[in-house]
Amino acid sequence: MTSISQTAAPARAQAAPKAKARNAALDRARTFITMLVLIHHSVIAYTYFGHTDKQKFLGFDCVVVFNDSFFMAAMFFLSGLFVWPSLQRKGINWFLRDRWWRLGLPYIVCVVLLMPFAYWAIELELHNPNTSFAEFWWRTVTVGPWNSGPAWFVWVLLALDVIAAIVYYALPDWVETIGKLSLESFGRPALFFWALLIASIIVYVPAVLYFGANRWFSLGPLAIQASRILLYLLFFFAACGIGAVSFDRGLLAPDGEMARRWPVWLGATIASYACIQLLIYIKHSVLPDINHQPLWWETAYALAFVVYSVAQTFNILALFLRFDNEGSSIFDPLRESAYGIYLIHYVPVLWLQYLMFGMSFGPVDQITAIIKAAIVFVLTLASSWAATAALRKIPGATHVL
C-alpha cells in the first residue's frame, strides 16, 4: 500500500487543484440526508415536542427522533470523506481558501441576514407581532440570542476542516491507521462498525450524562450541542481516514461487503430505533417523573442513541452503494443545489409555518398538522431550490453554492 505520508508532501507543492470525479452513491446519500433535514424542520412545529402550533401529530415526533438521532453525525461523516483527498489534491493553502469561500462566506451571510429574517417570523408569531425587522435584527446581533439555525453545521464543519489541515501539516501519517482499518474492512465491515461504535460510546455517553442532551455552547452566533462535540469530531475524522485511501478498495467500495450486507445494517438500525422508542415510552408512561430520569434510563438512552447513529449511517451508505450507485436517480436533479437548499431552507420553513399558524385544514388537528407539514415541505423545497438555481447563475457563485 502506498503510504499516505508519501503522497502528502508533494501535494503541498501543487499550485492548483485538479478536478476529481464525483462518487454518485455518496452524492445521492448526501442529497437524501439534506431532504431529511427539510422534512425534519417542516414537521417539528407540529410535534408534541415542538410546542409551536396547536395542531400536532404524534407520528411527527417519531420522525424527529428518527432524524435527530443520526443525521447530523452522518453529515459530518459524509463531509469528512472528501477532506483528505482534497488536501492531497489542492494542498493546504488552496484547501483552506476553498473552505473559506465554500463555508465561511455563506455562514456569515446566513447569520447576518438569512437567520435573523427567518427567526423574525417566530418573534411575530409567539412574542411581539409589532416588532419591525430592523428592531429585531439589532436586538439579535447586540443583545441576543443570536440564533444561527441550521447554519451551525457550517461553522462547525469549517472548524473541523481547519483542524484537519493542521493535522495534515503536523501529523500527515495520523489518519493512516484509520485508512488501513478501512482497507481491512473491505471484506469485514464489522471491524470498522465496532471500532466506530466503541469509540462513539466512549466520547458520547459520558458527555451526555454530564452535560445533558439539550445544553448548547454558544458565543454569539457560534453554537454547538455540548454533548455531541466529540461525537461529531469522531465521525468526521473517521471519515477522513476512509477518504485517505481508495474508496474502491476500502469500506465504502461498491462491491465490498458493507454494501452486500445491507440487511445487517438495516436490521441493526430498526432494532436500535425500536429501543429508543421503547425508552421514550418508558419515560412518558412508566417513570414517575417525566422531567427527571434515573441514571439507568439516561445511560440506556445514550447507548441506544449511539448504536442507532452508527447503524443508520452504515445503513444509508450501504443502501446507496448497493442500489443507487449507477445510472440515473431521483436525487440527481437536486445534487448541484443541495448545499444551497440547506443554507436557504430555514427562511421559507419558518415563514410558511408562521403564515399558517392557527389555521385549520381538517376536522381534526392531526389531519391539519399533516397537511400543514406537507405544504411547508413542498413549498420550502420548491422555493429554496429555485432560489439556489437563480443564485448559481451569478458569475462565480458556483464556487460557493
Where are the regions a protein language model picked out?
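Alpha-helical transmembrane segments and their immediate juxtamembrane cytosolic regions
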Residues: 2-401
